[in-house]
Amino acid sequence: PSHYYTINIQIMTPCIQIKRVYEAADPADGFRILVDRLWPRGIRKDALPYDLWPKDLTPSPALRRWFHEDPDGRWAEFSQRYRSELATAPSVNEVISRIRPYDTVTLLSAAKATDHNHALILRDFLTQRMG
């Protein structure tokens, strides 16, 4: 007799967390991505463990300067503009293919603000693109 099997394949997406670059690295961080365009102040290049630094996934210099003039007042529009930049960033698909095998991915940023920073938008963008 022939038997038919149904195989359910679920593609898992990594848990993407955000951490300040000044916090200690931890093996639980998984794949670590630096998401600031500029190297963080006060950190030696050999003192920050990271796996990837895709500068084109960071806000453009002009957008970053504009946002920093009024972070609270410009957050909503910054979010829209940054998402538009991400939609055309050349390395998006490469980054997604690099992080997909990991259970955990950590976005590293020097940003002090935890409620209004680009890493939040990038996390949501990557999660949606992988979903």
What is the predicted role of each segment?
Residues 1-11:
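N-terminal amphipathic/basic-hydrophobic helices that include classical n-h-c signal peptides
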